[in-house]
Amino acid sequence: TWDKVVKEQFEKRNPNRRVFQMTRAAFAGLQRYTFGWTGDCGNGDDVTQGWGQMANQIPVLLSAGLGIIPFTTCDITGYCGDIEDYPAMAELYTRWIQMGAFNPLSRIHHEGNVAVEPWLFGEEAEKNAKAAIELKYRLLPYIYTYAREAHETGLPLMRPMFLEYPADMETFSTDALFMFGSE
């Protein structure tokens, strides 16, 4: 496969360096070669569509983590769509950043020349983005622990609630909540 070849060729040419790559195509065994990415999602033309797109990422990330690649992420801020009214998007931006802090990899990304720096969304959004990013850094020892577990067992960092609470039947019908590790 492409990802296997890229990894092998990189390691051949750079024996003392680790390779990092992301893919949105997946099949069994791919987790040995790459990080998963859900692909381009959009915010649409208005804030309402953006909320739906962000909500859609959670079940996609959980499914990918369970079935294909335990290290899977999404484009924080939604990637596609014009942002014409930054103040109107501030709350959505804040929630994207907060949700993204609990992705195995946090990556703010948007298409073209659309700027997504926190300060563009106002002081409150900037403050909240900073807090989420600082939390992610404080969690690094925890993340490393569960990343090791994911490597050894295949259990993802982002986990559906039913993995931790299998006796609670309600956890099997929710796809909007998740655990980050088991604690």
Each predicted region: which residue ranges?
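Catalytic-domain carbohydrate-binding cleft regions of carbohydrate-active enzymes
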Residues: 1-183
